[in-house]
């Protein structure tokens, strides 16, 4: 469960 955006998400 990731309540934060991943480090590889597009801008």
Swiss-Prot record:
Tissue expression remark: Expressed by the venom gland.
GO cellular component, one term: extracellular region
Positions carrying Pyrrolidone carboxylic acid: 1
One GO biological process term: regulation of blood pressure
Keywords: Hypotensive agent, Metalloenzyme inhibitor, Metalloprotease inhibitor, Protease inhibitor, Pyrrolidone carboxylic acid, Secreted, Toxin
Single GO molecular function: toxin activity
Main location per the UniProt record: secreted
Localization per record: Secreted
Similarity comment: family membership: Belongs to the bradykinin-potentiating peptide family.
Its job: This peptide evokes slight hypotension (-2 mmHg), when injected alone into rats. It has a bradykinin-potentiating effect (75%), when 60 nmol of BPP-11f are coinjected with 0.5 ug of bradykinin into rats. It inhibits angiotensin converting enzyme (ACE) activity with a K(i)app of 82.10 uM.
Protein name: Bradykinin-potentiating peptide 11f
Native species: Bothrops cotiara
